[in-house]
């Protein structure tokens, strides 16, 4: 009887020890995925235009990249230079090749590829990442209003274009809008870009 008790006790000690060391084994934490908290608003519009390099560029070419879209025109003396200066700063800050910038002219009659090329050079635009586009005015309106859901100005008045930046993720989903002239919006924009690049 005494032998059985010692044997049982020994088995219990071994079992408890095994459980103790098993439960106290340090496990490597699972890597956390960094995801943006921005909502998925809607699919970005399809479009096609002529770039500052006189090449046809389609929105499908942005697939797999995070991109920022905005509207401007080269003869604009108001918000456009400030907005393009913002984009220039973002281009310099973020070196990721899968971050693109797309500026769409709201004055296609004036903003020929040659005019866009001169304007792009003014802001040191890297043509592999920053595209300025000319497209027919009806396409501009459709892309801006129906596609990106931006406010529409008065008929044929390019001065009334939106000053908002539209941020699109790698799958082509619109994820946010940021006022390109509001200093307080820029840190939020930079955070959004960082988050989407990490997705």
Short names for language-model regions:
Residues 27-60, 85:
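N-terminal "domain-start" segment that seeds a small globular fold
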Residues 19-22:
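C-terminal motif of bacterial Sec signal peptides marking the signal peptidase cleavage site
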Residues 155-199:
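Thiol-/selenol-based redox modules, centered on thioredoxin-like
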Residues 84-143:
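Structural microenvironment flanking redox-active thiols in thiol-disulfide oxidoreductases
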């Amino acid at each position: 009887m005494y032998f059985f008790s010692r044997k049982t006790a020994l088995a219990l000690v071994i079992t408890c020890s095994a459980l103790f060391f098993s439960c106290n084994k340090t496990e490597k934490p699972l890597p956390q995925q960094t995801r943006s908290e921005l909502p998925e608003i809607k699919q970005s519009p399809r479009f096609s235009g002529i770039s500052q390099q006189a090449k046809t560029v389609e929105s499908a070419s942005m697939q797999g990249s995070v991109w920022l879209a905005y509207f401007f025109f080269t003869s604009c003396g108001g918000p456009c230079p400030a907005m393009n200066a913002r984009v220039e700063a973002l281009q310099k800050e973020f070196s990721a090749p899968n971050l693109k910038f797309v500026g769409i002219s709201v004055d296609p009659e004036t903003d020929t590829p040659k005019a866009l090329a001169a304007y792009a050079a003014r802001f040191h635009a890297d043509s592999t990442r920053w595209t300025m586009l000319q497209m027919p005015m009806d396409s501009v309106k459709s892309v801006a209003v129906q596609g990106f859901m931006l406010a529409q100005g008065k008929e044929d008045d390019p001065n009334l274009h939106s000053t908002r930046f539209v941020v699109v993720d790698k799958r082509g989903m619109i994820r946010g809008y940021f006022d390109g002239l509001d200093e307080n919006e820029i840190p939020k924009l930079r955070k959004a870009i960082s988050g989407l690049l990490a997705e």
